[in-house]
């Protein structure tokens, strides 16, 4: 009976998944139900939750991941400074920093020749390190304290110390703006902008149609879905949210960065970009220590991922192959200058796009928009779930069927779009300034020539004395940048190693999983079979011996017979 029970038990072991079942269903269900961090599926809170797992900085709020996988959000304090000259600070002592969870609004004030922040203290708390341990006790992000008397005014500096965070408040915002300003100065020093003479500005072109960069992002996303999930992309809608884009960031496990030198001057520099980190748990981090220098650029520490390893960086570095550096306050950078300090991880960007299946009814503008009528919620599918990336990070080999090169292209497209947008806005400002100077100069000259007639307006009998020329400089700049982007793509494609990977990798990766499984079975299978056969033979020999001994009686020895 015992041997039969063991045989049945061994047979049933084949039917047990032992926890290695495909987690795609569970991961996709969590992704669909709770959404992205900045969606705030868990609602709003007035205080940072004490049991939070991690936190992500969003535009105007901070999202906290709870143990039930919901994201709860807390609004950051608002600046209520009155217009006009700053008032005197109502404080006798000034602190270096105050955490943003200890007040709901703040103002700017002046004391002497310096500007400070002031607010009413709602609670007191001691400062300390963040809840997320990055590696060791010396690499934690320090949180600001809340010292003072509850209900009274407090004042603090407008610049936070190095590696000190106020929880997404005005100090963190000032730090991000300072980093952006310094990166723009570095970019202008490396790449001087093309200047037009005021009298040689290109003439007006035709009006621009739909933004070409948005169409490129949608086309790249469609091609990526076509390679990974053909059944979904056959009939679906790709939906982009209105408002400022917040791309998704997924881990990049390859340390794809290069040290910038004089020979490598083609590093793409973009302004700091706010992103939503997804699927980060353990990552390889890049660390640059602080030397207490006034010229340091504090990028902060990552607060959404643990660091399994840390690489010390001492010089300027550039992200390559469409990757970005993700640092404190989940801000993305493509270039880290010489004097940067902080803790960052490498990531790849994906657009914040939702997918609607073709059989899902999509509402169109109708009378419902004017007369309220409850409408059924649309079932959106997040892009990460549609691509199978969520399961790929869990199983490791499940998502190998999607080509890595396609993710690189899509991330590269997003980075280029941000750089183009920044350059275009700068050109718009320069155009307005140059046109204003030309108009004023010409106006003065014409007024002098027609002074006897009362000026140029009275001489021409015009009702409107000002005219702004709509120049085509912005359109020419966009065209030039698009040509430059195409040139860089051709340079990347001319690399034999990258071209070889792009041509063979998508076809080899789908067979890699079954091939590794077959090799594993051929290597370990004979050993397991031999052990199982030996075990069964031993049990059969024992049973055979027991059956034979039942037909005989044991003979008594001479001593037992005498007794």
From Swiss-Prot:
Answer yes or no on keyword Transmembrane helix. Answer: yes
Q: Does the keyword rRNA-binding apply?
A: no
> What parts of the sequence cross the membrane?
504-524
**Residue ranges, Extracellular side:** 19-503
Which stretch carries the motif CXXC? Answer: 236-239
Subunit structure as annotated in this protein's UniProt entry? The mature envelope protein (Env) consists of a trimer of SU-TM heterodimers attached by a labile interchain disulfide bond.
The entry's free-text remark on domains says: The 17 amino acids long immunosuppressive region is present in many retroviral envelope proteins. Synthetic peptides derived from this relatively conserved sequence inhibit immune function in vitro and in vivo.
Recorded protein name is Envelope glycoprotein
Naturally occurring in which organism (per UniProt): Baboon endogenous virus (strain M7)
């Amino acid at each position: 009976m015992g041997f039969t029970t063991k045989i049945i038990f061994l047979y049933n072991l084949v039917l047990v998944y032992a926890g290695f079942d495909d987690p795609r269903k569970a991961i996709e269900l969590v992704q669909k139900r709770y959404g992205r961090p900045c969606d705030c599926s868990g609602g709003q809170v007035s205080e940072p939750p004490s049991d939070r797992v991690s936190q992500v900085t969003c535009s105007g709020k901070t999202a906290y991941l709870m143990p039930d996988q919901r994201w709860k959000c807390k609004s950051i304090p608002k600046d209520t400074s009155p217009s006009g000259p700053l008032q005197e600070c109502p404080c006798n002592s000034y602190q270096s920093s105050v955490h943003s969870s200890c007040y709901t609004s703040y103002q700017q004030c002046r004391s002497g020749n310096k500007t400070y922040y002031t607010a009413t203290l709602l609670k007191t708390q001691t400062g300390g390190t963040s809840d997320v341990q990055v590696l060791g006790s010396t690499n934690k992000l320090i949180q600001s304290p809340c010292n003072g008397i509850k209900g009274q005014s407090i004042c603090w500096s407008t610049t936070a110390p190095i590696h000190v965070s106020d929880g997404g408040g005005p100090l963190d915002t000032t730090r991000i703006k300072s980093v952006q300003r310094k990166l723009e100065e570095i970019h202008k020093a490396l790449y001087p902008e093309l200047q037009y003479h005021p009298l040689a500005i290109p003439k007006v072109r035709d009006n621009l149609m739909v933004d070409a960069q948005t169409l490129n992002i949608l086309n790249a996303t469609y091609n990526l879905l076509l390679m990974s999930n053909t059944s979904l992309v056959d009939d679906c809608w790709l939906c982009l949210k209105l408002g400022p884009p917040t791309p998704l960031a997924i881990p990049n496990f390859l340390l794809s960065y290069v040290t910038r030198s004089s020979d490598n001057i083609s590093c793409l520099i973009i302004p700091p970009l706010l992103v939503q980190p997804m699927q980060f748990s353990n990552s390889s981090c890049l660390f640059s220590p602080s030397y207490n220098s006034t010229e340091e650029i504090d990028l902060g520490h990552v607060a959404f991922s643990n660091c399994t390893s840390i690489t010390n960086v001492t010089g300027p570095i550039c992200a390559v192959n469409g990757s970005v550096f993700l640092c404190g306050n989940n801000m993305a950078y493509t270039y880290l200058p010489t004097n940067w300090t902080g803790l960052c991880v490498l990531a790849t960007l994906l657009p914040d796009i939702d997918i609607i299946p073709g059989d899902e009814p999509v509402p169109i503008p109708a009378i419902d928009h004017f007369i309220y009528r409850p409408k059924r919620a649309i079932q959106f599918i997040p892009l990460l779930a549609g691509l199978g990336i969520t399961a790929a990070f869990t199983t490791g080999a499940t998502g190998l069927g999607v080509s890595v090169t396609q993710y690189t292209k899509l991330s590269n497209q997003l980075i280029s779009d941000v750089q183009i947008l920044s350059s275009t806005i700068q050109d718009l400002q320069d155009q307005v300034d140059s046109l204003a100077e030309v108009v004023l100069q010409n106006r003065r000259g014409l007024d002098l020539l027609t002074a006897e007639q009362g000026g140029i307006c009275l001489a021409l009998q015009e009702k409107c004395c000002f005219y702004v020329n709509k120049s085509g400089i912005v359109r020419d700049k966009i065209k030039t940048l698009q040509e430059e982007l195409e040139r860089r793509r051709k340079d990347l494609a001319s690399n034999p190693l990258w071209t070889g990977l792009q041509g063979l990798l998508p076809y080899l990766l789908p067979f890699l999983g079954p091939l590794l499984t077959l090799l594993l079975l051929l290597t370990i299978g004979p050993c397991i079979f031999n052990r199982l056969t030996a075990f069964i033979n031993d049990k059969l020999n024992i049973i055979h011996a027991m059956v034979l001994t039942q037909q005989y009686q044991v003979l008594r020895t001479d001593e037992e017979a005498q007794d």
